[in-house]
């Protein structure tokens, strides 16, 4: 059966709004290509960066970040292997990252949920410009995590996939015309752009000779 996410990109969007598709350079990345890229990144982390667990690494580093509303800085702890897909689309690359990491937990299902909350969600980041793709990325990731047996606690973090333009630099919140929810999305994305020491940028950014991105 054809993946409905693929159907959205390849059929629906091309018929519903071909101009938007062309203007934004939106094209679906074939699954074999996605799998190859994710496995390659995992292998490079192991062989070139001396991280035996690759994408599943849980080590942390410290970095000085700005305090909100002040000019001062404080030291904050981050996971070393921070992952970012700057053009998330429907979440194809991020879901493949989850699948790659999940393979390393074969026979350790009992610790998977804790790992997801403590060491996966805090470092899996995505930016997406189009609302429909953003919504489907959240749906796709949530469905996959449920399929893996992930059982969230009452303190579950949200998925760190945000509706934002990756090419916009961090800028302080101005509190102008945005609705509250959209303002929060922008604020959260800005913090990632400003503070998070991203180690792995992975994905397939949209391309068009005349792209409006």
Spell out what each predicted region is.
Residues 4-213:
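SAM-dependent methyltransferase catalytic region
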């Amino acid at each position: 059966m054809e993946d409905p996410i693929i159907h959205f990109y390849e059929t629906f969007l091309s018929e519903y709004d071909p101009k938007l598709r062309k203007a934004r350079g939106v094209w679906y990345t074939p699954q074999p290509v996605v799998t190859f890229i994710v496995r390659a990144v995992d292998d490079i982390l192991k062989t070139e960066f001396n991280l035996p667990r690759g994408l599943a690494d849980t080590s942390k580093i410290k970095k000085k970040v700005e305090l909100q509303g002040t000019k001062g800085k404080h030291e904050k702890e981050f996971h070393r292997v921070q992952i970012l897909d700057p053009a998330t689309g429907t979440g194809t690359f991020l879901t493949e990252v989850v699948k790659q990491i999940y393979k390393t937990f074969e026979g350790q299902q009992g610790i998977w949920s804790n790992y997801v909350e403590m060491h996966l969600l805090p470092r899996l980041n995505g930016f997406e410009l189009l609302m429909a793709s953003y919504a489907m990325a959240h749906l796709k990731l949530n469905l996959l995590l449920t399929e893996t047996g992930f059982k969230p606690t009452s303190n579950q973090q949200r998925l760190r996939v945000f509706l934002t333009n990756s090419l916009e630099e961090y800028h302080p919140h101005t509190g102008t015309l945005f609705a509250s929810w959209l303002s929060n999305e922008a604020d959260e994305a800005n913090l990632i752009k400003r503070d998070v020491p991203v180690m792995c940028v992975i994905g397939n950014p949209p391309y068009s000779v005349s792209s409006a991105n």
